[in-house]
Amino acid sequence: MVYVSNGQVLDSRSRSPWSLSFLTDFFWGAVEFIGLFFQTLVQPDLSKDGNNSASSRFSDGRGPPGFPGRRRMGRINHGAGPTPPPMGGGGUGR
């Protein structure tokens, strides 16, 4: 963590960014990233726990979403205020 003491910016990190533990963690992180990248190219519907997302889509117990209901036709009217006037057609009878 970075902090300021006596007008100087100090860093409290005790380990070097090039230490052996950092390099091994970075290496294994890169290996896992590359492995998961190619695994999702081959099997794109793979979820985090390794199951197919199609079969475990609702594995948390929620269930599928409800039926969407009827689709309403016409203009949106929420009952707030008067209806707008009819469109002007300029019908002067010519």
From Swiss-Prot:
<dbReference type="InterPro" id="IPR024491">
    <property type="entry name" value="Se_SelK/SelG"/>
</dbReference>
<dbReference type="Pfam" id="PF10961">
    <property type="entry name" value="SelK_SelG"/>
</dbReference>
<dbReference type="GO" id="GO:0006816">
    <property type="term" value="P:calcium ion transport"/>
</dbReference>
<feature type="transmembrane region" description="Helical">
    <location>
        <begin position="20"/>
        <end position="42"/>
    </location>
</feature>
<keyword id="KW-0109">Calcium transport</keyword>
<keyword id="KW-1003">Cell membrane</keyword>
<keyword id="KW-0813">Transport</keyword>
<comment type="similarity">
    <text>Belongs to the selenoprotein K family.</text>
</comment>
<keyword id="KW-1133">Transmembrane helix</keyword>
<dbReference type="GO" id="GO:0018345">
    <property type="term" value="P:protein palmitoylation"/>
</dbReference>
<protein>
    <recommendedName>
        <fullName>Selenoprotein K</fullName>
    </recommendedName>
</protein>
<dbReference type="GO" id="GO:0005783">
    <property type="term" value="C:endoplasmic reticulum"/>
</dbReference>
<dbReference type="GO" id="GO:0005789">
    <property type="term" value="C:endoplasmic reticulum membrane"/>
</dbReference>
<comment type="function">
    <text>Required for Ca(2+) flux in immune cells and plays a role in T-cell proliferation and in T-cell and neutrophil migration. Involved in endoplasmic reticulum-associated degradation (ERAD) of soluble glycosylated proteins. Required for cell surface expression of CD36 and involved in macrophage uptake of low-density lipoprotein and in foam cell formation. Required for palmitoylation.</text>
</comment>
<dbReference type="GO" id="GO:0032469">
    <property type="term" value="P:endoplasmic reticulum calcium ion homeostasis"/>
</dbReference>
<keyword id="KW-0712">Selenocysteine</keyword>
<keyword id="KW-0472">Membrane</keyword>
<keyword id="KW-0406">Ion transport</keyword>
<feature type="compositionally biased region" description="Polar residues">
    <location>
        <begin position="49"/>
        <end position="58"/>
    </location>
</feature>
<keyword id="KW-0106">Calcium</keyword>
<keyword id="KW-0812">Transmembrane</keyword>
<dbReference type="GO" id="GO:0005886">
    <property type="term" value="C:plasma membrane"/>
</dbReference>
<keyword id="KW-0256">Endoplasmic reticulum</keyword>
<dbReference type="GO" id="GO:0005794">
    <property type="term" value="C:Golgi apparatus"/>
</dbReference>
<feature type="region of interest" description="Disordered">
    <location>
        <begin position="48"/>
        <end position="94"/>
    </location>
</feature>
